[in-house]
């Protein structure tokens, strides 16, 4: 299934945890509004956060409250962005993005998740060189979608690559062109499954033992269940 398998597997898990996902998205929206103001016309980070929330069907009331909280109308918490790197079972590379109001608490929680599941938390840079940070847009395959037309729309909008896999199309962009490519695809009438700035693994790693597979799944679940964790990236090839 490759990278798309990883994404669809993550999406199905997220669908079962909507309330927690909304809490995390609200935090991102609040931070973006605090740092760049509440007007999406002048705040690309806020627009991206709201677009991501809408892809998850987050209610508009929740989005509005998060913006007001960020701009100081509804109270304000101070969060910092931290990226942790480490290894899962059998050396699987893992990157964890967090937004936290307590660095020590979050570091302890993340370290505990790695330690409990056959991995270890590493130092900055220990695995990030195995990934490329890119815009990643996923469109689910449907009968009415013509692959060649979608590919041309994507490339003409500025995409770097277009990949067709079993269940979905993957469009890769530079970070700078992410918003314009995303808008170009949406304006052409395509519905997006996901659209994010992501750490994309250069190569994928397979786990051979059932024990390692269980540990890796548990590691991902423990990290994603943490309210401070925004995104978990890895180079494990999930076999669906």
From Swiss-Prot:
It comes from the Bacteria. Keywords: Cytoplasm, DNA-binding, Transcription, Transcription regulation. Coiled coil: none annotated. GO terms for biological process: regulation of DNA-templated transcription. This is Probable transcriptional regulatory protein Clos_1778. The keyword Ribonucleoprotein does not apply. SUPFAM superfamilies: YebC-like.
């Amino acid at each position: 299934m490759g990278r798309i398998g990883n994404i669809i597997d993550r999406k199905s898990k997220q669908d079962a945890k909507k309330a927690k996902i909304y809490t995390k998205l609200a935090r991102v929206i609040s931070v973006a509004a605090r740092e760049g103001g509440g007007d999406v016309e002048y705040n690309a980070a806020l627009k991206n956060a709201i677009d991501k929330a809408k892809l998850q069907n987050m209610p508009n009331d929740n989005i509005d409250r998060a913006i007001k909280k960020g701009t100081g109308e509804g109270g304000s918490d101070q969060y910092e962005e931290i990226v942790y790197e480490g290894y899962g079972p059998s050396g699987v590379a893992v990157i964890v993005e967090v937004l936290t109001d307590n660095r020590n608490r979050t570091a302890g929680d993340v370290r505990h998740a790695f330690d409990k599941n056959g991995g270890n938390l590493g130092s900055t840079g220990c695995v990030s060189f195995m990934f490329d940070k890119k815009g990643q847009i996923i469109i689910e395959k449907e009968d009415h979608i013509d692959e060649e037309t979608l590919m041309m729309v994507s490339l003409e909008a500025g995409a770097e690559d277009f990949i067709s896999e079993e269940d979905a199309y993957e469009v890769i962009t530079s970070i700078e062109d992410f918003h314009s490519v995303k808008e170009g695809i949406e304006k052409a009438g395509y519905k997006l499954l996901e659209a994010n700035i992501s750490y994309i693994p250069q190569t994928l790693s397979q786990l051979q033992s059932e024990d390692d597979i269980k540990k890796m799944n548990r590691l991902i679940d423990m990290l994603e269940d943490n309210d401070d964790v925004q995104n978990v990236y890895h180079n494990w090839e999930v076999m669906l």
